[in-house]
């Protein structure tokens, strides 16, 4: 048991002196310290609200500065850095888009399932370059093989076919999508429900659709005319089907006449490209014009030839 002296009230001189020196100091009792767990009392002075507002303003200033820096770092369309982003694709993405162009299916949109709002120029650029090179090389090889079968055919390397193939393929892969994109933009003003693809998406559609022509051109080395036309028809059907299935969601909101005419023109231009490649790069050269050997005729031995005298010695 505690003694009576221990239970009596004691004054502490240090506390008394402290209160005398600082009469405005806040005091707390022991009951205030015994607060339930999980409850924290926070005392905010008169300047606390201003500190919170300063932090919010500082964060907003940082966000605005970061956005301004990003806008300044974004290159213009006339710079090389702007177009560099369109070549930033990996091999798996390019192969997936090539596979999508080779296996068109109804209801399977190439733009939505393979491009995913990220068109690239890497695939279309190299597909067009490869197709132009393969066209020129196989066209010359066809003439070499024809000369080996028929020596009367005269062959000389035709390097101009590389230029013709490059200009034809790149003009088709860029000018036709440009005209199609412009027409769809114009039809968007007539039919407000239509949402055309962007120009780069249209170029990407046409560029990947030309990939199927590369193996077709290689198979044209087989010197069988009907087999060459069969391979051409199969490649044209796959490529044109991919274009129709991709463009149909855009043009179906328009009138039936406009949609039918537009898709027919797209298929017709594709067919003209395939036929032009077949007829120009794989035409057979005519045989070399060789002069016939002179024919020597012998006269019978019983026919005597009369000698001829010069005109000056002939009798008058």
Curated annotation (Swiss-Prot):
<protein>
    <recommendedName>
        <fullName>Protein YIPF2</fullName>
    </recommendedName>
</protein>
<feature type="transmembrane region" description="Helical">
    <location>
        <begin position="125"/>
        <end position="145"/>
    </location>
</feature>
<feature type="transmembrane region" description="Helical">
    <location>
        <begin position="232"/>
        <end position="252"/>
    </location>
</feature>
<dbReference type="GO" id="GO:0031267">
    <property type="term" value="F:small GTPase binding"/>
</dbReference>
<dbReference type="GO" id="GO:0016192">
    <property type="term" value="P:vesicle-mediated transport"/>
</dbReference>
<feature type="topological domain" description="Lumenal">
    <location>
        <begin position="220"/>
        <end position="231"/>
    </location>
</feature>
<feature type="transmembrane region" description="Helical">
    <location>
        <begin position="164"/>
        <end position="184"/>
    </location>
</feature>
<feature type="topological domain" description="Lumenal">
    <location>
        <begin position="146"/>
        <end position="163"/>
    </location>
</feature>
<feature type="compositionally biased region" description="Polar residues">
    <location>
        <begin position="25"/>
        <end position="36"/>
    </location>
</feature>
<keyword id="KW-0472">Membrane</keyword>
<feature type="topological domain" description="Cytoplasmic">
    <location>
        <begin position="253"/>
        <end position="256"/>
    </location>
</feature>
<feature type="transmembrane region" description="Helical">
    <location>
        <begin position="257"/>
        <end position="277"/>
    </location>
</feature>
<feature type="transmembrane region" description="Helical">
    <location>
        <begin position="197"/>
        <end position="219"/>
    </location>
</feature>
<dbReference type="GO" id="GO:0005794">
    <property type="term" value="C:Golgi apparatus"/>
</dbReference>
<dbReference type="GO" id="GO:0031902">
    <property type="term" value="C:late endosome membrane"/>
</dbReference>
<comment type="similarity">
    <text>Belongs to the YIP1 family.</text>
</comment>
<feature type="topological domain" description="Lumenal">
    <location>
        <begin position="278"/>
        <end position="316"/>
    </location>
</feature>
<dbReference type="InterPro" id="IPR006977">
    <property type="entry name" value="Yip1_dom"/>
</dbReference>
<keyword id="KW-0333">Golgi apparatus</keyword>
<keyword id="KW-0007">Acetylation</keyword>
<feature type="topological domain" description="Cytoplasmic">
    <location>
        <begin position="185"/>
        <end position="196"/>
    </location>
</feature>
<feature type="topological domain" description="Cytoplasmic">
    <location>
        <begin position="2"/>
        <end position="124"/>
    </location>
</feature>
<keyword id="KW-1133">Transmembrane helix</keyword>
<dbReference type="GO" id="GO:0000138">
    <property type="term" value="C:Golgi trans cisterna"/>
</dbReference>
<comment type="subunit">
    <text>Interacts with YIPF6; this interaction may stabilize YIPF2. May also form a ternary complex with YIPF1 and YIPF6.</text>
</comment>
<feature type="region of interest" description="Disordered">
    <location>
        <begin position="16"/>
        <end position="37"/>
    </location>
</feature>
<dbReference type="Pfam" id="PF04893">
    <property type="entry name" value="Yip1"/>
</dbReference>
<dbReference type="InterPro" id="IPR039765">
    <property type="entry name" value="Yip5/YIPF1/YIPF2"/>
</dbReference>
<dbReference type="GO" id="GO:0030133">
    <property type="term" value="C:transport vesicle"/>
</dbReference>
<keyword id="KW-0812">Transmembrane</keyword>
<dbReference type="GO" id="GO:0005797">
    <property type="term" value="C:Golgi medial cisterna"/>
</dbReference>
<feature type="modified residue" description="N-acetylalanine">
    <location>
        <position position="2"/>
    </location>
</feature>
<dbReference type="GO" id="GO:0005802">
    <property type="term" value="C:trans-Golgi network"/>
</dbReference>
<keyword id="KW-0967">Endosome</keyword>
């Amino acid at each position: 048991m505690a003694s009576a002296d221990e239970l009596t009230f004691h004054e502490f001189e240090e506390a008394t002196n402290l209160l005398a020196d600082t009469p405005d100091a806040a005091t707390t009792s022991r009951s205030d310290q015994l607060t339930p767990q999980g409850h924290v009392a926070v005392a905010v002075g008169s300047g606390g609200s201003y500190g919170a507002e300063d932090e919010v303003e500082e964060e907003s200033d940082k966000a605005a500065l970061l956005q301004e820096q990003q806008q300044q770092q974004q290159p213009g369309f006339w710079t090389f850095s702007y177009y560099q982003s369109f070549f930033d694709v990996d091999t798996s993405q390019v192969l997936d888009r090539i596979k999508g162009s080779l296996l068109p299916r109804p209801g399977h949109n190439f733009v939505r399932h393979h491009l995913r709002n990220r068109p690239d120029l890497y695939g279309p650029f190299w597909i067009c370059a490869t197709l132009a090179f393969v066209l020129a090389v196989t066209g010359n090889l066809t003439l070499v093989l024809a000369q080996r079968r028929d020596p009367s055919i005269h062959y000389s390397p035709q390097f101009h076919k590389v230029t013709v193939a490059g200009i034809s393929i790149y003009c088709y892969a860029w000018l036709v999508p440009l005209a199609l994109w412009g027409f769809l933009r114009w039809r968007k003003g007539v039919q407000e429900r239509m949402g055309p693809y962007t120009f780069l998406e249209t170029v990407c559609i046409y560029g990947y659709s030309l990939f199927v022509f590369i193996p077709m051109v290689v198979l044209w080395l087989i010197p069988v005319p009907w087999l060459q036309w069969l391979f051409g028809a199969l490649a044209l059907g796959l490529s044109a089907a991919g274009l129709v299935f991709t463009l149909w969601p855009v043009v179906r909101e328009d009138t039936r006449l406009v949609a039918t005419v537009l898709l027919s023109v797209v298929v017709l231009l594709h067919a003209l490209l395939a036929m032009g490649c077949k007829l120009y790069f794989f035409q057979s050269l005519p045989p070399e014009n060789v002069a016939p050997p002179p024919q020597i005729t012998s006269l019978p031995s019983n026919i005597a030839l009369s000698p001829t005298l010069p005109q000056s010695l002939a009798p008058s």
